[in-house]
């Protein structure tokens, strides 16, 4: 037991987690936390990913129905990183879960917005791949064993996309994943007309698919294009925070301005702008979600934006 051989008061705070996962309390970590929550008070951070729509949930009315969304970069334009510069960087992982073991079709699509969002390249997982990945790459720095070096993909992006699927042994649910690392090709896609999108097609009426991004560099958006949908912030909750018998903790706003030991007052909002952090309200970045079992998380919120602390005796002024 986490509280030891002799039962004693025990509180454990976990300020960590990931937005990837089934979000249904059935994973090994979720089951472990639920069991230990019987013996200790376990507090888990909700997460700080709610600024963007990093989840997408769809219940299909019929078999063969499709939902489409754009994989939109969180930071558009140039992004210098070390010796490289990326353009409209899309980097991270996406996981899509069926509500049960029923399969669905999953595709990452290179979309040509100049041609009415016509598919230029499809990178599909049409049936269970049992974890075997299919990778498309631009070649050059992104050449890798087993990858399909696709010239149209390379015209759009420098980078790669890998897709795979399997039945999750922990949850019993069928799921598909994509790993993405793309930067717009500055010779043939400098205007950004080639974009990445996600397509999912159902196999049964009433089938539900829950899609989660890792909230690093990509979110789900319709880009104001017909036939595409935006994602939702509802579902940005950390997968670890979905366990039973725990206390899931979000953030609320305490102050939006604060004095510093340098004599100046700092704040989140600039003069003339709207108040993004109104005192007493849940912080916009604080993750949340409504789970399939009906629970709304987090359960409570604690001061998080911003936390005001006393000055400790070891504080010294930086001479620079």
Regions found by a protein language model. Give the residues of each.
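Loop-rich non-cytosolic ectodomains and luminal regions
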Residues: 1-320
């Amino acid at each position: 037991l986490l509280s030891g051989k002799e039962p004693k008061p025990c509180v454990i705070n976990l300020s960590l987690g990931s937005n990837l996962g089934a979000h249904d309390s059935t994973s090994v970590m979720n089951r472990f936390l639920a069991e230990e929550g019987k013996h200790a008070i376990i507090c888990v951070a909700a997460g700080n990913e709610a600024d963007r729509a990093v989840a997408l949930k769809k219940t299909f009315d019929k078999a063969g129905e499709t939902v489409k969304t754009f994989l939109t970069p969180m930071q558009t334009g140039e992004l210098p990183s070390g010796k490289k510069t990326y353009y409209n960087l899309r980097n991270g992982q996406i996981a899509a879960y069926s509500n049960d073991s029923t399969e669905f079709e999953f595709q990452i699509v290179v979309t040509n917005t100049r041609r009415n969002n016509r598919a230029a390249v499809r990178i599909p997982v049409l049936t269970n791949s049992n974890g075997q990945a299919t990778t498309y790459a631009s070649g050059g720095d992104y050449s890798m064993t087993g990858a399909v070096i696709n010239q149209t993909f390379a015209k759009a992006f420098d980078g790669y996309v890998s897709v795979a699927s399997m039945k999750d042994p922990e949850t019993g649910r069928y799921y598909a994943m994509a790993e993405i690392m793309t930067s717009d090709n500055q010779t043939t896609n400098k205007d950004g007309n080639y974009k990445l999108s996600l397509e999912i097609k159902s196999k049964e009426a009433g089938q539900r698919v829950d899609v989660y991004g890792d909230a690093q560099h990509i979110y789900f958006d319709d880009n104001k294009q017909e036939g595409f949908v935006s994602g939702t912030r509802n579902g940005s909750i950390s997968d670890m925070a979905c366990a039973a018998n725990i206390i899931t903790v979000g953030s609320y706003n305490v102050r939006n301005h604060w004095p510093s030991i340098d004599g100046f007052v700092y704040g989140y909002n600039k003069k003339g702008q709207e108040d993004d952090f109104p005192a007493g309200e849940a912080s916009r970045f604080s993750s949340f979600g409504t789970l399939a079992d009906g629970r709304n998380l987090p359960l409570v919120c604690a001061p998080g934006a911003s936390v005001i602390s006393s000055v400790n005796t070891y504080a010294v002024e930086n001479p620079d």
